[in-house]
């Protein structure tokens, strides 16, 4: 029995539906790579209509002046975690026009996240690091591993990003207290996490289902 199949069934038991309204956009030098644990495809509209915790992975690119020549800069993926809004949200990265700008941004990236009415939203950020050859080629798995951990911008409820399902935060029936997950791979850890998140009745239904597989 594959853990992925079990985990997908588990998420189906506790997932809800969400209606969308406001949109999330970025300045011209911002590219969205992931949103709430899911891969973002080109020209995808990112939408929220609540004040729940949300997470994006962005990449910043810019053509800048290097001596008498022009050069191209592309940042490593950066995770931004913030509370949503029913208004449109804009994520603004600074203009990077010189080697000094690039060096400062690499050292300490800064952003502005604000609503269309001008309200500034606080956020947490961290670099999303990959491993092995071409570490940034698998953003979603890297993000799932990050969210399972204790990084400053981690959101455990988005750890199921490798599953082809959009999760909704179930705030009515969750177990309270610290959740501890152990396992040899991401799928096993994700399964443990969501099992502990579920209420007792959901856990029982899931175990009954698993025994029949």
Swiss-Prot record:
Extract the HAMAP family matched here: UPF0319
Taxonomy of origin reads: Bacteria, Pseudomonadati, Pseudomonadota, Gammaproteobacteria, Pasteurellales
List keywords of the entry alphabetically.
Signal
Could you confirm whether the keyword Transmembrane appears in this record?
no
UniProt-listed InterPro entries: UPF0319
What's one Pfam family here?
A: DUF2057
Record family assignment: Belongs to the UPF0319 family.
> Secretion signal: which residues?
1-21
Task: State the species of origin.
Answer: Glaesserella parasuis serovar 5 (strain SH0165)
Q: What is this protein called?
A: UPF0319 protein HAPS_0727
- Which cystines does this chain contain? none
